[in-house]
Amino acid sequence: MSDIRLEPVTGSDPELKLALSASGLPTEDLEDTGRSFFKAVSSDRGTVGYAGIEACGDDVLLRSIVILPEHRGKALGKSLTRETLKTVNVSSAVFLATTSAAPFFESLGFVVVERADVPPAVLATRQLSGICPASATIMKLDRAPT
């Protein structure tokens, strides 16, 4: 059972931009096409965080997972990630780039992959082709083939 539910928001949502900026996450490509963003709402209707995904052909880039500071330490990041992954077609490979959260994502089933093993459509995203540093860790969700 999840502690949160997702509500769609646009890339131009000012609270989304503020939350990402405050956490040091990129905001420059939020309004580009192919992106979907969500506000994580608790049972009392309060916003606890935000998440996003980007379509890359048949694959998906998980991006912008952020829990607001006052809600951290309650395992909501895992709930938010799991709920966001439910929006992705089970046949899609899910990738992400991180500079600091690899252990967190490993706990959710992601494994480190080499850039050479990442599909061209994912590598061509603004996130992986220029916004994230080349030193970012690239990860893929390790799930059974469908």
Predicted region positions:
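Conserved beta-strand in the GNAT
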Residues: 39, 45-54, 59-66
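Conserved active-site alpha-helix within GNAT-family acetyltransferase domains
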Residues: 99-127
